[in-house]
Regions:
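Polybasic, glycine- and aromatic-enriched phosphate-binding surface used to engage nucleic acids
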Residues: 1-166
Length: 166
């Protein structure tokens, strides 16, 4: 306290952990894969978001995106589907994503922390924070490594997210 104000005094305790997928090999994709899926399937483009890890965050600098997240939170399928079979709806509406994720079905089904279906992410009360202006900082760093994101960048559990409240 002699050297400054604790960060918690400036944030209204709105400090959150980044996203835990439970299966990064399935849900975290390369820019090339993201571009191919988005080009073939424009409806799926909204489900592919920039994704950073703690080591990506630099002091005052957010580098070009090297990874993307397939972002389907818990409840995504049930809020949209018209068919009784969730996977059938998913495969019909997002065939390229369904094809990609189907390779990981066995592992994804075993995740304890997942959404309503194996292709959905775990529940989280603060997913909306990722769409707003926020500060991203790595959980482990030497010195201050933080960056202001104007909105839209998602981060893994090796990052903390400070909600700006805007």
């Amino acid at each position: 306290r002699e050297r400054g104000v604790p960060l918690s005094c400036c944030t209204d305790n709105k400090i959150y952990r980044g996203i835990l997928t439970g299966l990064n090999e399935a849900f975290v994709i390369s820019p090339e894969t993201a571009e191919a899926i988005s080009a073939e399937e424009p409806a799926s483009a909204e489900l592919i978001v920039p994704f950073y890890s703690g080591r990506d965050i630099k002091r005052y600098y957010l580098p070009p995106v090297k990874k993307y997240l397939i972002f389907m939170p818990k409840g995504y399928t049930d809020r949209r589907r018209e068919l009784s079979d969730g996977y059938l709806w998913f495969a019909q509406n997002h065939p390229r994503l369904a094809s990609h994720l189907a390779r990981y079905e066995a592992k994804a089904s075993k995740r304890r922390d997942r959404g309503d279906y194996w292709w959905e992410l775990r529940p989280c009360r603060y997913y909306d924070v990722f769409q707003r202006q926020k500060i991203l900082l790595p959980v482990i760093c030497r010195g201050i490594s933080a960056v202001l994101d104007e909105g839209g960048a998602y981060a893994n559990d090796k990052c903390c997210i400070i909600d700006s409240g805007d």
